[in-house]
A protein has these predicted regions:
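FIC/Doc superfamily catalytic core
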Residues: 1-172
Length: 172
């Protein structure tokens, strides 16, 4: 689907991100598709460690998601940055904004691959971002975290050392 859209030069947009997330979550319950919403009082939306059950990451509030996605879309569609940098930023921002209840990582990997393909840097059958990131999942997650606190509003919205993520991403 994405390769065909890249050939048609479909612009990077919030609608495209939502369409891809719906494909990623095909067969999931309706509440898992689309932007995440408000949590019930007393509940916190967070990414939890599967073993310890501790909150590893607390993304931005649901009400900030539309504006954050709009800013990302505007950046992608107006920047003169190198496509590899744009793809790295798309990946980081989608994982960090965490706009969906589920499928954020898969959607981020697909959308960063879309940016690369659309701008002439596709993999053309020699591998994929999924394979690269799965090769050493621990390093992937550590690079994304960049040693920052778990709370989005405590530095992840504007990381002081993005070169940690760029270095990892650009080694692919």
């Amino acid at each position: 689907v994405l390769e065909e859209k890249a050939k048609q030069n479909v612009p990077f947009s919030k609608e495209l991100i939502l369409e891809i997330q719906a494909l990623v979550e095909k067969g999931a319950s309706e509440e898992k598709i689309g932007l995440r919403g408000e949590m019930p009082p007393g509940f916190l939306f967070a990414v939890y460690d599967s073993e310890s059950g501790e909150a590893e990451y607390i993304p931005p509030e649901y009400c900030d998601i539309p504006e954050l996605l709009d800013e990302l879309v505007e950046y992608v569609n107006t920047t003169d940055d190198h496509p590899l940098i744009v793809a790295a930023i798309v990946h980081y921002q989608l994982v960090t904004i965490h706009p969906f209840e589920d499928g954020n990582g898969r959607t981020a990997r697909l959308m960063s691959g879309y940016v690369l393909t659309q701008r002439g840097y596709g993999f053309h059958g020699i591998g994929s971002l999924e394979e690269y990131f799965a090769y050493d999942a621990d390093e992937y997650y550590q690079s994304l975290q960049m040693g920052l606190p778990a709370l989005y509003y405590s530095g992840r919205e504007n990381p002081p050392h993005p070169e940690i993520w760029f270095d990892y991403f650009l080694r692919m």
